[in-house]
Amino acid sequence: MKTRDMNRDWIATAETLSSALPYLQRYDDAIVVIKLGGHAMGSDEGMESFARDVVLLRQVGVNPVIVHGGGPMINALLDKLQIKSEFVNGKRVTDAATMEVVEMVLSGMVNKRIVQAINAQGGKGIGLSGKDANLITCEATDPALGFVGTPSEVNADMLKNLFEKEFIPVIAPIGSGTAGETFNINGDTAAGAVAAALKADRLLLLTDVAGVKNAEGVVVTELKAADVEEMTAAGVIAGGMIPKTETALAAVRGGVRACTIVDGRVPNAVLLELFTDHGAGSMIRS
């Protein structure tokens, strides 16, 4: 005969699952685009945890799409090859030599690491870049930035076809130009374009900061578009946070219900943001 004492941990687990029910119902068949920043990838254990969360999303009926970065990995290889990098407003200046390294790291090393992690958890991760099936078509952002592209069109139908087969798309932010060029796309920008094209229910930008902070250094949990514009004009939002908030504004104005800048270092950050009252970052709405 088996016996078991009911302890507080088990009861707390059951209560957590029960309280998540309204959120699970809300996100049934929802599209959630997740930007996984290079700084948020962390250790193998962190990647395993992230992959488990993504597979869980798929299991409960959510259609997740991963768009990833890889800045630290790109920098490491550029340093090894003694190729210098410059940044303008958070965007990497990309010459031909740098573009080769960027594509090698993003489409090869980083993309396949994420796909492998998802598949190891029982998911059906499939690796793509924006060049596959013209997934992301680009225009040059600024001649001064070299091969840096701004998305002009996203093949949303291809992603929807993958959802029907229960695949989890993992997208490297590399795009094609109309003349056959290869462009480096800021990962946040690529994620925002994908989310807008899909009219996603949520866009989550996972990074290595707690969220958008006010002038006193306190994380602001909810912001309107006007708040973001005011804080940017005042210099409170600056540096690498600018592309993220610009992405958030473009996404919500393009039809995404909400965008949250999430601290990807927090365990189970994606689940906390979607399925609890607490959340895990700064949510931006129109």
From Swiss-Prot:
Cellular component GO terms held in the UniProt record: cytoplasm
Localization terms from the record: Cytoplasm
Function: Catalyzes the ATP-dependent phosphorylation of N-acetyl-L-glutamate.
The keyword Cytoplasm is assigned to this record: yes
Catalytic activity from the UniProt record: N-acetyl-L-glutamate + ATP = N-acetyl-L-glutamyl 5-phosphate + ADP
Keyword set, alphabetical order: Amino-acid biosynthesis, Arginine biosynthesis, ATP-binding, Cytoplasm, Kinase, Nucleotide-binding, Transferase
GO biological process entries: arginine biosynthetic process via ornithine; L-arginine biosynthetic process
Residues that bind substrate: G70, G71, R92, N184
Feature type site, description Transition state stabilizer: K35, K244
Gene3D superfamilies, A to Z: Acetylglutamate kinase-like (3.40.1160.10)
Gene that encodes the chain: argB
One MF term in the entry's GO annotations: acetylglutamate kinase activity
EC assignment: 2.7.2.8
Pathway: Amino-acid biosynthesis; L-arginine biosynthesis; N(2)-acetyl-L-ornithine from L-glutamate: step 2/4
Protein name, per record: Acetylglutamate kinase
Pfam assignment, any one: AA_kinase
Family as reported in the entry's similarity comment: Belongs to the acetylglutamate kinase family. ArgB subfamily.
HAMAP family noted in UniProt: ArgB
Principal place of residence: cytoplasm
Transmembrane spans: none
Organism lineage: Bacteria, Pseudomonadati, Pseudomonadota, Alphaproteobacteria, Rhodobacterales
InterPro entries: AceGlu_kinase-like_sf, AcgluKinase_fam, ArgB, Asp/Glu/Uridylate_kinase, Glu/AcGlu_kinase, NAGK-C
